[in-house]
Amino acid sequence: EEKFREQGKNILIEYAKRIIENPPTVISREHPFEFSINNNIFIRGKIDRIDQTENGISVIDYKTSKTPSLAKKNIQLAVYCLYLSQAVEDKITGTPSSSSLYFLRELEEPLSSHSFSNDELNNIKNIILNIAEKIRQNLFDPKKGYHCNWCDYKHLLCPKFETKV
């Protein structure tokens, strides 16, 4: 436990140094959102940080994982951009000019950024629709794994966790 506390402290110190050196124009933190795709898929969540930049708005998602990944392949970031691109009742709207994964443990290159095009966002929307349809039709082969520990749905609709009566 002490080891993790020390790691957390060091991560926060490094993050604070970076922010002080290059302060962002933060317009929202933990920004709640809720929207639907085709009025039958409902998505909600919170965007870690939204900044105002010279080029528009920028979405940042903080990550504590040890292995950095590419923003371009991150569906979570794309969902944030999808929401903002179609938001009408929010004070913050419009397709973000960039979206970034901020890897807090990464000292050299903490950011992985990507600007999602409209075509990419439409592709993500179609992927979500296809996955949702397959889930509704029970056309998937769920695989139990370590990731199941964080799944909110395992006891609601996952066949791998159904109890036999």
Predicted segments with their positions:
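A non-catalytic, helix-rich entry segment at domain boundaries
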Residues: 1-32, 36
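Generic recognition of stable, solvent-exposed alpha-helical segments in well-folded globular domains
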Residues: 3-10, 28, 42-45, 57, ...
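Short, surface-exposed helix-loop/turn micro-motifs enriched in polar/charged residues
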Residues: 4, 21-25, 41, 69-72, ...
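Non-catalytic protein-protein interaction segments used by genome-maintenance enzymes to assemble
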Residues: 28-88
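Metal-dependent nuclease catalytic regions and adjoining charged, substrate-binding loops involved
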Residues: 85-165
